[in-house]
Amino acid sequence: MWWRRHASKVAVGLIGFFAGVWGVGVGEVPLFDWDEVNFAECAREMRVSGNYLYPQIGFLPFWEKPPLFFWVQAGFMAIFGENAWGARLPNVFISALTLAVLYYLGRRWHGEGFGLTWLFLQGVSLLPSFYARSGLIDPLFNLFMLLATVCGAYAVEKGRLGWALGMGFCAGLATLTKGPVGLLMPALAVGTLLLFRRQLPRIGVLLLGGGLAFGMVVGPWLALLLQSDGGKLLADFWAYQWRLFSTPDAGHGGPWYYHLVVVAIGMFPASLWAIGAWRLPFRKLPAPAQALLWLTAWTLVVFSIVKTKILHYSSLSYYGVSYLAAWVWLYHRRWIWRTGGVLTGLIGLLLAIGTLCVGVIMHFWPRWIQQIKDPFMQAAIQNTPLDWEGTEGWPGFVLAGGLAVLYLLPWKNTGRLGLLGLVCLLWEALMLRQLAGRVEAYTQAPLRQFCTEKAQEGALVWPVGFKSYIPFFYGQMSPDASPAVVGDTDLFQQKLLAGEMPFPVYFVSRVDRYKPFQEAHHLEIVEQRGAYVLLAPPYRGPGQAGK
């Protein structure tokens, strides 16, 4: 086939196409609370304070994450601005680079056709495409762990020190991106490969080379961190990591099978095809491919055990799922158009119907709004001036129509794969364009508007009764009007409520949580917008809101 003769050019074209699709409008919808806004604020505060050693929130040390991703984000913000564009564009480039890595690995292991198929299936699957448009840490974190695992597998297979150094280097970068899981997951995968292939004598090369490179990457940062605060930040960081493992932190609990469901739906259509890989000749695969599948298995096992259940925790498994789907497509295609084809059609039809129903359901919201028991959600829908015509879910027709064409036209297999991928990619892009802005309007737009409006007046907006990073980022918090002034966030809030700070301040809360603060501190309601209430203190201190 012509594409086999020009595989590298096709790969470059596909990667450019995906990057273009992901990049279009990536900054049009504001950043979402918590994670996107949290990470963008860490990068912004690095730029404002000039402190790049560790992340900050409220210009106080933020011990939940290491700094590497925020360095990258701060660099993009220097070019594209401190906004949604600057926060999300890094992942467009990182995800495009990831596709290039998958193509290279697939071609090296199984040939050009496999590399292109793996690249394509990863790019069109739902959650990888979604994360490419996000401001989250995980695309960069996962890429480093993938590279560390592959390098470690080659070290096991070839026994060369250079590959062990590569594993330690990439694991070190992963650790600087999000924490010790960046070392744990590649170590589990490569360690299992050592046992499976009975190459235990090569553990010395791995420990020596990997440990040396890991220490060279992470060691200087740890030394500077210890020198700066005597180890308190590191102690807080480890306590946080243990809390994530042992408790459903921040209310993010769930059943043990949570991530199995997430991967099954989030990796559509690749996940359905991957089911057919039960005939995979695992022992005949190259060592790095075996390590990748061990990495996938360990990801699902570890994060099914971890008490905190968050959507992107299992995102490291996506590489293995798309790898299995590519194998089934190339070597077990009969399963694709029998069982796999039926499953793809059924799930695709359900997704299409669900998309179509969104607009219809919201069009009739006055009929069912009283059935909602959550006062915040009820107020958000009732008080947000959004018109629903009932046709907003029209991208569902794109998915349903594409599936119909896929099954009715007598196209060749390559054409079918391309059509299915493009339909999924187009449906997701259109759905996000139609609905993401409306979700933001209900959930956080009034809060964001309060913060930006009052920031223009030179006032601080502070959240009470709920946690949000929006006042920090969209309120453009400055060091001299932040918790850093008193050295503690809780103390800062107490002083704000007591009127002891020398700058104008407003308070914002949810409609279901503001009354205790209003009554205890005699706050005045300035405005209710959507599901949020803007409050001002009654005192008349110098420069204070409510003056």
PLM regions: where:
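Membrane-integral, polyisoprenol-dependent glycosyltransferases
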Residues: M1-R338, G390, F472
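Membrane-embedded architecture of ER/inner-membrane glycosylation machinery
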Residues: L165, L280-K547
